[in-house]
Amino acid sequence: MIRVVTLDSYDEKQLAKFSRTLYTAFGVGSEHTGQFELPAGLPEPLDAEKALDAVKGVRAYKDDKVLYLTSRKLKERELPSGTVPTNGFSRFGKDKAIITSVGHKDLEVGFKPVARHALHQLGHLWELHHCLDPRCSMYPPWTPSFAAGEPTFCTFCREKSEQKIRLAKS
């Protein structure tokens, strides 16, 4: 089950469409679990890693994945290749990820790029690595073409995610 937790207010119809997209991509249930508040004192732009640590936990089963959705800006990250914009962060192979819809008026206007970032971060939770296919949601998100793509996986990444999900269920 993918549990979507909002840290800011979003339209319920848009969240339902967002959850359906996650269900279509992964083949597991997806639901909006609720809206939580970020603890006071977190400076903006948010440090994605610290925000994941600070936010209140969600009641979930061991194989559930929790996706936090915020409209606040996330702090850029330093990588060996340089500074990259951060539209999301996940703990590889773990259970929590965060993405932002910053730069889009609402979830409907920015649906494709936000959904694509969601698939990307959730893919990391199921231990998917970056993909070389620019049409795939696991393509590196800091590339210029990433936001224009559809929220889908290539055949290889889809099969690998399905395999990981099946293993988690058994």
Where does each model-flagged region fall?
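Metalloprotease/metallohydrolase-associated module, dominated by Zn2+-dependent proteases
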Residues: 87-113, 129-170
